[in-house]
Amino acid sequence: IQEDDANANITDGDRWNDIGDYEIGQTVPYKYTSNVPDINGYDTYYYAWHDVMSDALTFNKNSVKIEISGTVDGKAKTYTLSNTEFAVKEKPGNGDTFMIAVADLKAIVDREFDAVDNRKENTYGQTVTVTYNATLNDKAAENTGRPGFENDVRLEFSNDADSEGEGKTGYTPWD
């Protein structure tokens, strides 16, 4: 969550923190970062974020933005995925509020960050950043004095190179 006002306890210069102080009706921004693993053994690579928001938060589907940052020929580059390169599904099941899925992260990274190492394999490790917003709604007033409204996210990813990205997936722990 990005804190909406300066706070000496937040050491991150852009005010990103695990908690925030918002009022009903305000937009609450979220940001998650991860790194592209070595996916040379895959033909395709599935990558998805699963999010479970409190009922006091209303997800803004149109606010989703995904960027991949890395280097090309020694120069910094950030690529923003188009809306056709990922899908947002609300209430996909399993208690998730929504899911953001990139069907083939490998194809995008290989196209936009085409560096290879001395073995002629693609170089990975780029940073993937997903941002989106929610609005603190009137349900927040139903339980005043509580410590806050939880928002949990986990990453789902291909984890079987032999299945061509269509098979088994793994998950990170909820955070």
Segment roles from a protein language model:
Residues 1-41, 50, 150-155, 159-175:
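Serine/threonine-rich, low-complexity linker/repeat segments that form flexible spacers/stalks
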Residues 18-21, 70-139:
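Extracellular adhesion/glycan-binding regions together with long Ser/Thr-
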Residues 25-29, 44-46, 61-63, 95-97, ...:
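Extracellular structured ligand-interaction cores
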Residues 32, 45, 112-173:
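Serine/threonine-enriched low-complexity regions used as flexible
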Residues 51, 82-84, 101-112, 149, ...:
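Extracytoplasmic/secretory soluble proteins
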Residues 68-72, 157-159:
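Short acidic, glycine-rich loop/turn motifs
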